[in-house]
């Protein structure tokens, strides 16, 4: 946070925008990486998250190889958060955390892959299409959809409901 705040401290009459990149790096090294549950591979991760009721059973819709294809596509983009605030917001509000210690079970790329797989409902080509749009930041679903898709213990996927009401 200190590095992020230094952005507004002018040096030679210019904002220190590079401090934001330093803040993102520091946030990952000092906080995110230390508080993320480590899995040896995707199969171990998916099995754990499904068996412990964090995710719905994606194996009912996809083979492990299909799931792996979507994750591989997303991770191949080598996504990096553009700012400290975006990274902080994702990990504070959207990343899946474990029940006991609040450790992270997902990275941003994992959330993208899971949302894509969920929305495609078994159509791996659609899942890859969605994943491509999301990781390239061409489209961002509404908060409830991005937050809850694919989670076993989730809320609604929409942020509002339209009801028809009579005039009496």
Model-derived features with residue positions:
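Extended catalytic cores of very large enzyme megasubunits
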Residues: 1-168
């Amino acid at each position: 946070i200190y590095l992020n705040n230094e952005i507004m401290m002018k040096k030679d009459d210019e904002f220190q925008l590079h401090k934001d990149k330093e803040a993102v790096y520091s946030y990952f090294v000092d906080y995110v990486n230390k508080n993320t549950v480590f899995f040896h591979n995707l199969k171990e991760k998916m099995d754990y998250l499904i068996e412990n009721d964090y995710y719905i059973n994606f194996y009912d819709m996809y083979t492990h190889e299909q799931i792996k294809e979507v994750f591989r596509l997303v991770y191949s983009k080598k996504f990096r958060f553009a700012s400290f605030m975006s990274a902080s917001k994702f990990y504070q509000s959207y990343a899946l955390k474990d029940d006991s210690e609040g450790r992270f079970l997902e990275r941003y790329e994992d959330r993208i892959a899971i949302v894509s797989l969920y929305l495609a409902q078994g159509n791996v080509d659609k899942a890859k299409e969605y994943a491509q749009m999301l990781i390239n930041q061409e489209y961002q679903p509404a908060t409830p959809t991005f937050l809850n898709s694919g989670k076993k213990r989730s809320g609604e996927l929409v942020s509002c409901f339209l009801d028809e009401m009579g005039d009496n």
